[in-house]
Amino acid sequence: MTVTPERKEAVEFTNPNLKVAVQALVPQASTVKNLDDLATRTTIVTTGTTADIWLTKNHPDWKLLKFEKNSESLQALANGRGDAYAQDNLVLFSWAKQNPGYRVLTQTLGAEAPIAPAVKKGNIELRDWVNVELAKLGEEKFLLKLYDQYVRKELSDDTKPESVIGEGGKWQG
């Protein structure tokens, strides 16, 4: 789950193990070149996502088309109901690789953010246990091994593991 101040009020986050940034996916033939171009277009978001929250707060004048599920949002983009789909870049990199004809804009919407497991608010014992285990897994480069085995083939060839992994729960944000 992406760590946000609002979510910190509801859950206890462990140390982060991944990092993500919100970017936008557009059709390959789109005239949209950068985020400024989206100010006068329709941007699709999935309700409750980091992209939805950030755009609603920082660009209240942008036209947002909201859907409940990622699959609905992506289908809406494919059907031409919007000009771009804003979402966590890992989702977009994977989708663009599997669906030729789309590209991810290089600019990010806001800063890079940590992703971390979450536990019930107040369960400090479980949070601390997870943090200890994350540190042990980091020493073994466990997430890098998982990345190589499962994730690397899903993302673009130029995606560097350190751009998405916070091995051992270490976050430099």
Residue ranges and their predicted role:
Residues 1-4, 20, 28, 48-50, ...:
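Beta->alpha turn/N-cap motifs
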Residues 1-10, 78-111:
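A ligand-binding cleft/hinge motif common to bilobed small-molecule-binding domains
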Residues 1-37, 108:
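Acidic, polar ligand-binding/catalytic clefts
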Residues 15, 51-68, 96-97:
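Ligand-binding cleft/hinge of the Venus flytrap
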Residues 35-51:
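Short loop->beta-strand "edge-of-pocket" segments that line small-molecule binding or catalytic clefts
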Residues 18-26, 51, 93-151, 153-173:
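Periplasmic-binding protein-like
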